[in-house]
Amino acid sequence: MSEPFMFEKPLGMRDVLPNLHSMQRKLGDRVLQEFRLWGYEQVQTPTLEYYETVGKASAISDKQLFKLIDFHGNTLVLRPDMTAPIARLVSSSMKDIPYPLRLSYCSSLYRALQTEGGRPAEFAQVGVELVGDHTASADGEMLLLLNRALIQAGLDHFQVAVGHIGFLNALFLEIFGTVERAELLRRQLYEKNDVGFKEQVKAFGLSSIDEKKLLKLSRLRGNEAILAEAEQLTESAEGKQAVAELRDLWQGLKEGGLTRYMKLDLSLVLHMSYYTGCIFEVYHDRLPRPLGGGGRYDHLLAKFGRPGPATGFGLRLDLLAEAVGKLEVQPKKRCLLYSRERRQEAYRKATALREKGMQVVLQDVAGVDDIDKMSASYEEIVYLIGKTEEGKR
């Protein structure tokens, strides 16, 4: 392996420059404020977790984990997601606080890359977890809150696809009996490869009835009308229960006046394997990939010794910033350029402006090589150079 150049960064790691950093921070603040209004309390978990606990409980594949060894020989991982760490937190430090719990976060996540592929290995995510509530009302709260958070962030023309992993699991079990062949179809659905899905279905050599069911599954996208079709596809109690839960959820969304942002997609599959019920994903025309998603995961907390139902979602701040495109007019950038004899005057003026909430840079003229180039970075320059009009220093 050749030595990296001084300016190179590890695979997938990126610098965030001031304008983008400021935008991501402001968007994160807006989203967190909306979470607070809904009663969600912000928490922070360590960047490093034990591989044997959070690492193995996480739905992120082992090859995507950044692993380290501590001085005692324990294998650690850089935090790959927030759901597993919060499950650990709820089951330990918060074990005496009764359910339901409403928690929020804004944290960096780390996932190792095999190739560059345009994806980051580190990214900031903002999200919520509602722990201890099994009802459809909790699922509805996630979708209502998701919509409000996106609107408050300044996003428009987004769409949320809503599905149910329990429906897919039930249908696949009815047709295949085992999970092996079903996993091949899940991969095609996750990649949204309709052509590959159809080819794989035909390659199985299924009965004409089962083949038609699977091909119809890939077209079950739209409004609540598709739920009647979905109910006819499945014969199991689990499959019909999943459809009933989606119908109940959709009714709640109608009551919240937010179905215009929603579509049902019974073929939806997400990256995380721990989902058990309603799942959803957010799309925007400006983005080549979903900017966030989430769903119900009722079995994860049991791995940490405190069983309980849960649901939640996360949004990537870098993708949210890309989708929003541009925030409202940014604060004016001002600079007080002063010489040494007027330094005290410059300090007073800067303090007065900052007390009014204005952004002000104080710059000693002796520290500037090219005043013209420096001035181009500011919308307003105030020169405090040389003696004052009264001749005072």
Curated annotation (Swiss-Prot):
What Pfam families does the annotation carry? HisZ-like, tRNA-synt_His
What residue range is the signal peptide? none
* Top-level taxon in the UniProt lineage: Bacteria
Indicate yes or no for the key word Cytoplasm: yes
The question of whether RNA-binding is a record keyword is answered with no
Database matches in InterPro entries: aa-tRNA-synth_II, aa-tRNA-synth_II/BPL/LPL, HisRS-like_core, HisRS/HisZ, HisZ, HisZ-C
* An individual GO BP term: L-histidine biosynthetic process
Primary residence: cytoplasm
Q: Which UniProt keywords apply?
A: Amino-acid biosynthesis, Cytoplasm, Histidine biosynthesis
Q: In which pathway does it act?
A: Amino-acid biosynthesis; L-histidine biosynthesis; L-histidine from 5-phospho-alpha-D-ribose 1-diphosphate: step 1/9
Q: Which GO terms describe its molecular function?
A: catalytic activity, acting on a protein; histidine-tRNA ligase activity; transferase activity
A GO CC annotation recorded here is: cytoplasm
Q: Where in the cell is it found?
A: Cytoplasm
Q: List the disulfide bonds.
A: none
Q: What does this protein do?
A: Required for the first step of histidine biosynthesis. May allow the feedback regulation of ATP phosphoribosyltransferase activity by histidine.
Q: How does it assemble?
A: Heteromultimer composed of HisG and HisZ subunits.
Its family? Belongs to the class-II aminoacyl-tRNA synthetase family. HisZ subfamily.
Q: Please, what other remarks does the record include?
A: This function is generally fulfilled by the C-terminal part of HisG, which is missing in some bacteria such as this one.
Name this polypeptide is given = ATP phosphoribosyltransferase regulatory subunit
Give the organism, scientific name.
Shouchella clausii (strain KSM-K16)
| Gene that specifies this protein | hisZ
